[in-house]
Amino acid sequence: RTCYKTPSVKPETCPHGENICYTETWCDAWCSQRGKREELGCAATCPKVKAGVGIKCCSTDNCDPFPVKNPR
């Protein structure tokens, strides 16, 4: 499997056994100025949802592109 990974945001081969791509988004102290933080990567299972964190998982190559920002 290949997934986009941060910080490079380039497709990379996932380690053996990690067949899920994920996009995790959350707000930090700069959220109102910069927007949500994003983390992209590979996992063996979809990460557990935590309060205030959005998670999207998928299982095809490069299915987790960096979220598109709305122009201001």
From Swiss-Prot:
GO MF annotations in UniProt: acetylcholine receptor inhibitor activity; ion channel regulator activity; toxin activity
Entry keywords, A to Z: Acetylcholine receptor inhibiting toxin, Disulfide bond, Ion channel impairing toxin, Neurotoxin, Postsynaptic neurotoxin, Secreted, Toxin
Entry's localization field: Secreted
Principal cellular location given in the protein's record: secreted
SUPFAM superfamilies linked to this entry: Snake toxin-like
Gene Ontology cellular component annotations, sorted alphabetically: extracellular region
InterPro entries on file: Snake_3FTx, Snake_toxin-like_sf, Snake_toxin_con_site, Toxin_cobra-type
Disulfide bonds, paired cysteine numbers: C3-C21, C14-C42, C27-C31, C46-C57, C58-C63
Top-level taxon in the UniProt lineage: Eukaryota
Role noted for this protein: Binds with high affinity to muscular (alpha-1/CHRNA1) and neuronal (alpha-7/CHRNA7) nicotinic acetylcholine receptor (nAChR) and inhibits acetylcholine from binding to the receptor, thereby impairing neuromuscular and neuronal transmission.
UniProt record similarity statement: Belongs to the three-finger toxin family. Long-chain subfamily. Type II alpha-neurotoxin sub-subfamily.
Name of this protein: Alpha-elapitoxin-Dv2b
